[in-house]
Amino acid sequence: MASAPDYGKYSEVLAKKMDPVVLAEIRALEANNDVANPRYMELLIPNFYNQHLMRLPEWPEPVNRMFKHLNGEIYTMMQGPSEFGISGRLSKWDRKADLPQLTLPVLTIGAGNDTMDPKHMEWMSTRVRKGTYLHCPEGSHMAMWDDQKVYMEGVISWIKNLDGK
């Protein structure tokens, strides 16, 4: 998304879809600055990540490897400690007004279950001069894995059509 504040607002839309009991426990951990508590990830993985980050029953090895090497300190510094809103250094980051300055072909990709608002991703494609939007209806944030056919066919088609842009 081109706006961290908009991303934060959309995370609240996703939060409202969660089991209220689970969300309340997540919010309590966040309110107590206890996101390092293993219980936080025990709640996030099945109730948020498995719904909006990666929708496969078993995550591919490269995804697991990425999480193993994720720099949590930097992630938290940029995003903030919560998956529901942005309070880190990117909290006010917003580049929506700059999108029309992009003159190269741009492919924005949204997914039906993404952590990023697919409507915002589609909107972005209309703001750049040579934008195309690809929607992966069954995908999540990692649609390249969990809606692979739509994702790969869409990216390949977009690349093949670049000469026309």
Residue ranges, per PLM feature:
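Active-site nucleophile loop of the alpha/beta-hydrolase fold
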Residues: 1-7
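Alpha/beta-hydrolase
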Residues: 17-100, 104
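Conserved loop-alpha-helix segment in the C-terminal half of the alpha/beta-hydrolase fold
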Residues: 96-139
